[in-house]
């Protein structure tokens, strides 16, 4: 059992490579369309928010909105839920950050020269060179800004990936073969200990998402994470700031219900008015 995450530059050919590897390995292929559809299952409102915020750099105002924070939390919970299923190719969505340190996950970035990216877009989308260049610049700026805001890192920094491939210097067939082999090498790393790390991360993300999207939970700051990475017996920690003291009990009850037998601790503080607190998604 293994996982492949692919971050790609727009027009690099990364999407085709991801599909090809998924087909060769008979892995599930999870892309933007599937994740947005899953988020929409939380309600039509969240489906609309997903379309509004997806892969775009939010404005200074938007980044503090309840809807943006809820969208990010839902997106991360869905990615980790798919990762639990194994045998999956996850396209983008910050999967490389969410699965950092998971030994049976192979995290790659695919890039290409500007000239090759423009050529692909002119052929695929029927754009002229000027419009293709403009679109690439816009997408790079929006996606790069969104990733930096959420994860605090540059999305094209090689240190956040196991491998970086360049379709301008390597043939797609060679990249596909290499990626396939590397994914298969990681199957043996799917140990019980490694799986517990992923399970606890996924549980924390599920709790965070459930709290984040509930409009009756007046949260101005939120941090939900494993208390000790991979150690289920220590459970998860929920920290936050609320501006309605009566909501604390409901938040705690919701988290406990999701966690079941897994321990959960709380550090929820009350402040009498809402503040622009920090939400931890990294």
Regions found by a protein language model. Give the residues of each.
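Divalent-cation
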Residues: 92
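Glycine-rich phosphate-binding P-loop
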Residues: 4-21
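N-terminal targeting leaders
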Residues: 101, 119-123, 148-159, 164, ...
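ATP-dependent small-molecule kinase phosphotransfer cores
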Residues: 35-87, 127
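Conserved phosphate-donor/acceptor-positioning beta-strand/loop module used by diverse small-molecule
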Residues: 101-124, 132, 136
């Amino acid at each position: 059992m293994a996982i492949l995450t692919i971050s790609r530059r727009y027009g690099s050919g990364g999407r085709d490579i991801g599909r090809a590897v998924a087909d060769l390995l008979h892995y599930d292929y999870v892309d933007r369309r599937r994740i947005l559809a899953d988020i929409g299952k939380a309600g039509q409102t969240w489906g609309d928010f997903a379309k509004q915020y997806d892969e775009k750099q939010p404005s200074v105002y938007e980044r503090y909105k309840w809807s943006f924070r809820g969208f990010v939390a839902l997106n991360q919970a869905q990615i980790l839920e798919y990762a639990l299923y194994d045998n999956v190719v996850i396209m983008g969505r910050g999967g490389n950050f969410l699965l950092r340190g998971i030994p049976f996950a192979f995290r790659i970035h695919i890039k290409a020269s500007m000239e090759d990216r423009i050529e692909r877009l002119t052929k695929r989308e029927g754009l002229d060179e000027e419009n293709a260049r403009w679109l690439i610049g816009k997408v790079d700026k929006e996606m790069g800004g969104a990733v930096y805001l959420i994860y605090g890192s540059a999305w094209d920094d090689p240190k956040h990936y196991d491998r970086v491939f360049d379709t301008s210097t390597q043939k797609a067939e060679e990249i596909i073969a290499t990626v396939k082999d590397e994914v298969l090498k990681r199957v043996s790393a799917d140990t019980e200990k490694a799986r517990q790390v992923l399970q606890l991360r996924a549980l924390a993300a599920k709790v965070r998402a459930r709290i984040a999207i509930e409009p009756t939970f007046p949260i101005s700051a939120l941090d939900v994470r494993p208390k000790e990475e991979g150690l289920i017996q220590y459970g998860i920690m929920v920290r936050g700031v609320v501006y309605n003291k009566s909501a604390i009990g409901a938040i705690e009850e919701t988290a406990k219900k999701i966690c079941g037998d897994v321990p959960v601790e709380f550090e929820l503080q009350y402040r009498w008015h809402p503040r622009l607190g920090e939400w931890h998604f990294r």
